[in-house]
Design a protein with these regions (language model features):
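Residue-level detector of functional hotspots within protein domains
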Residues: 63, 85-88, 92-94, 160, ...
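A metal-dependent, Asp-based hydrolase signature
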Residues: 113-200, 205
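C-terminal cap/substrate-recognition subdomain and adjoining C-terminal extension
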Residues: 13-21, 41-64, 82, 177-382
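Charged, low-complexity surface segments at secondary-structure and domain boundaries
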Residues: 58-67, 149-151, 164-169, 337
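Electropositive phosphate-/nucleotide-binding environments in soluble metabolic enzymes
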Residues: 71, 173, 288
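Non-catalytic pre-domain segments flanking phosphatase-related domains
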Residues: 3-12, 20-104, 112, 119, ...
Length: 382
């Protein structure tokens, strides 16, 4: 064997060792690159989860509102949310100041079928409840007759206050838990004027989308209604994801079940005592009282308002008068007489009010693809 061949044989181990070293270096480099990619992806994912919506811009504004037509009210709302959620916008609003207030009847929930839901609850208590109808007072019975007149389209002066007083008395001495169950039992029955719907399911689905949309953009949602506060709590339980403390409504007194007529200043609440309805009306949460309760209970001026009647006018004007963050006020028009128990004359008056007061109208007839869901239909009117 010549020296040249011997030289090649002698170099083989060294070449193999060098090849192995290069292979291991390449593997290590690949592993480092892969690890770096995973680390970067992990950091990005974690940052995305921890970054508040208020710092992410308007990505969330594309969520929901699928039950709305491509209407002016929808455009106004979406454009507004896009402006106030962009950190670099001059109109940016911090999360803690993003507050929206909603009326209930006719704004989130069916207003008349044929009358307000709390009117129907009172009628049932006085005229049908086997445990109470024989105890009903003459004033309560007279109020029921006024409600029947109202159902037929008559104007009954002062009915809202008389009903609130009579209603409070009709449920006196009932515990809060008992009242909650009573209301829910009543709401579990079929809706009088509709097919395939229970009384408690008569929420406007497009408006529930608005609430979801606003909550996705870090809004605090409040209900501010003329309906009794504890009735609303029972109604929205499991339907709208807001704390009980975010519900503002008509007030009646609450006492301890051993308190009797002892003054609040003199009575000491007992351990393990329960709370009951005293049966005494305090205030109807309508008109200027809505502004009063908003500033008392929320402590800030909201930036969005949703209502449907003159009872919501003060609330609407309060919101659009916000000097720190100019707000928007929306008003629903009850102009759908096919899918809903609408009132065209009333809707036209509200539309005029919207034009005069810079409120944004929402047409139930033209702006919504559905009201209660396509499976729900209005019964034929006799």
């Amino acid at each position: 064997m010549d020296d040249h061949m011997l030289g090649n044989i002698d170099g083989l181990p060294e070449q193999k060792a060098r090849g192995k070293m290069i292979f291991f270096v390449i593997v290590i480099i690949i592993l480092l690159i892969v690890s770096a990619v995973f680390v970067v992806l992990f950091i990005l994912e974690k940052t995305n989860k921890e970054t508040p919506a208020s710092e992410k811009g308007s990505d969330k504004t594309k969520i929901g509102l699928t039950l709305w037509q491509d209407c002016n009210a929808k455009k106004e709302l979406v454009n507004y949310i896009e402006k106030i959620t962009k950190p670099d916008s001059k109109d940016f609003v911090k999360k803690e100041d993003r507050i929206a207030v909603f009326d209930l009847d006719g704004s989130l929930f069916q207003e008349t079928d044929l009358v307000y839901n709390d009117y129907k609850l009172f009628k049932y208590r006085v005229t049908e409840d086997p445990d109470y109808k024989d105890k009903a007072t003459e004033e309560q019975k007279a109020t029921v007759e006024d409600i029947k007149r109202y159902e037929k389209g008559e104007s009954v002066q002062g009915l809202d206050i008389r009903h609130a007083k009579a209603n409070a008395e009709a449920f006196a001495n009932m515990s809060l838990e008992e009242y909650d169950k009573y209301v829910k039992d009543f709401l579990s029955k079929p809706a009088d004027g509709y097919n395939n719907m229970k009384r408690g399911d008569a929420f406007y689905k497009p408006m529930l989308e608005v609430i979801d949309y606003l909550q996705e953009n870090d809004f605090l949602i409040y209900i501010c209604s003329g309906t009794d506060r504890f009735t609303i709590r029972a109604l929205v339980d499991g339907k709208i994801n807001i704390p009980k403390g975010n519900i503002i409504g008509t007030e009646s007194l609450i006492v301890g079940n051993y308190q009797n007529e002892t003054d609040y200043f003199e009575y000491v609440y007992h351990q393990n005592e329960s709370l009951i309805l005293k049966g005494e009306f305090v205030v109807k949460n309508l008109y200027m009282y809505k502004v009063y309760h908003i500033i008392r209970e929320i402590g800030k001026i909201p930036i969005l308002s949703f209502g449907n009647s003159n009872g919501d006018a003060s609330m609407a004007n309060f919101v659009i008068s916000n000097k720190d963050h100019p707000g928007l006020a929306f008003m629903l028009l009850c102009d759908d007489t096919e899918r809903e128990n609408g009132n065209v004359e009333k809707a036209n008056k509200m539309k005029e009010s919207c034009e005069q007061n810079n409120w944004i109208p929402i047409s139930m007839k033209n702006d919504w693809k559905t009201i209660y869901g396509d499976n729900v239909t209005r019964k034929k009117q006799e």
